[in-house]
């Protein structure tokens, strides 16, 4: 009996050891497999603080297995997903090129002056269109900032990486998600695949600042309108073991009678849930009370706030996440992905499904390609793109870039013609006798060899005059035209 009892105790002790070992293996297995998702809110220039968050996490070897963002958060998240380092992001946001992108200004060295008219006294101008038969309508601008520099920039940054991933956001260096706003159905639009640059461009399209774009037949605006902090998308799509959220913006403040942007924000935005359940992760709340959405001249100040704010959370994050990713491992991961990307070399230009006729398409394609059939690079594409914009014959032009089987790329241009007529008024109102009035009219005829005619009338006590002008562009390479003017 005594032997049997001792044997039973020994068996129980052995079972306990086995169970303890299994439990230890399960726990260590969970820890080693614990995945981490990073979610970045929108916030305009405040979103630069996310770069500081990423820098602090990387320095402390906190892994980032998935990343998602909205608006400015989508830009930072997408850059990280293709292997751009925090230091490289900072250099980009400090650059004069970035300033031209968000201001809508042509980059120096790319502006085309040969198509520009002589300056006039115009103060206000409206475009007139006859798109509806037998009806003349006014065409108002849809954005305050020219979208062309930003459109080209996102293509240059993201096109090759998207091709490497097979246009699947799960196959980027870091799997990625972003959110735009479907204003027709009034709901968030989650972007999981397709053209990465268009996904980013859609997510940061703040109403009235930037022109909206169409993705998958849906007109999309800034994702912050309906979901400014997509932690729910992160949880649903990736289900990471731990979520780190970086929040640099809140819900819309009370509207101000003197601030039209605050009024629009309250009209358009719905409230976002910024609360990450404690069992799912942690929220890094970054306060930037003196920074507005367009304060991109405060890059270093905003970055430092994000960086040092994150350091306050690091000990808690480390206790929740036992896995570590060394900087050497991150460097290898970046190099493995980035070395697969291809230089942007283009074979052809296409204009699918537009309201342009064949001669108009021919002019645009020849202008972009500089009347050449040879392979061309991104710099040549940019020059040709800006030449087309400078002609004032197109109201919108958005490039899509897709890889071919021969590892070259093709450009697909989404184009809408500009209104053919423009009416301008201006002048000078003075308490003295120096009053001056101006009235102008311009008509553009778009074709393979486009022409335009204009009439400008100035009326005043000291000067009155009439100027008539006719110009036609004949060649592209070399670029030449003829022009006739009459002044009275």
Please describe what each predicted stretch is.
Residues 6, 26, 30-32, 68, ...:
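Intrinsically disordered, low-complexity regions enriched in small/polar residues
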